[in-house]
């Protein structure tokens, strides 16, 4: 139903945000070295 679609989109968005945050941390860490 609609609710499961919303939950799925939210999960995908959360995963994408976590990946982007992790990439930003890696980038800043490599620049600091």
UniProtKB/Swiss-Prot annotation:
Leucine amide carried by residues: 33
Q: Which domain of life is it from?
A: Eukaryota
Places the protein is found: Secreted
Report what the protein is called: Dermaseptin-H8
> Which UniProt keywords are given for this protein, alphabetically ordered?
Amidation, Amphibian defense peptide, Antimicrobial, Secreted
Organism of this sequence: Pithecopus hypochondrialis
Predominant place of localization: secreted
- Record GO biological process: defense response
Name one matching Pfam family.
DD_K
A GO-annotated cellular component: extracellular region
Write out the function statement from the record.
Has antimicrobial activity.
State the family named in the UniProt similarity comment for this chain: Belongs to the frog skin active peptide (FSAP) family. Dermaseptin subfamily.
Could you tell me in which tissues this protein is expressed?
Answer: Expressed by the skin glands.
Against InterPro entries, the record matches this protein to: Dermaseptin_dom
